[in-house]
Amino acid sequence: VIGDILQRNCPAVIFLPHRDDWNKTHIGTHRLVMDALATTPGEFGCLVIETEYWQPMPDPNFMVECDPERLSILVNGLTFHKGEVARNPYHLDLPAWMQDNVRRGSELIGGQGGSACDIRFCTLYRVSRWQNGTLLRQDPAQAVLPADAWPCAALGTVSKKGG
């Protein structure tokens, strides 16, 4: 069913949790989408952007800044997820998680031992391209996306990593 939806709608970009995101629903979603991609015809292609939340990825290649105003909107929005925050108030830790992403991303994406990125909060992603039945890692043209930038600028032009 998901493969049919992909073929019918031909999305340019698909977001999904990365394979090892620990949470069983996230892992199941990853498997469902990857299985669906495998059913698409060879000419089908799109960007695949893997997200992380419960388990960090060892090799993200894209940082997206979240400015303090948007972060406050996210935290406020999460408070309406009553069942989740009643058992685990992770909305309170969201700013610290995004700060830690800046630390990790500065090293993993910017290069070990380099200067930290001049941002306070971010999310990390792994950008790949589904092409000819294969998932190929692709580094975005712009590895760090400022909060006020349009994502298509960074994702519209990608270069194939390693050749």
Segments and roles (model prediction):
Residues V1-G163:
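Metal-dependent de-N-acetylase/amidase catalytic core
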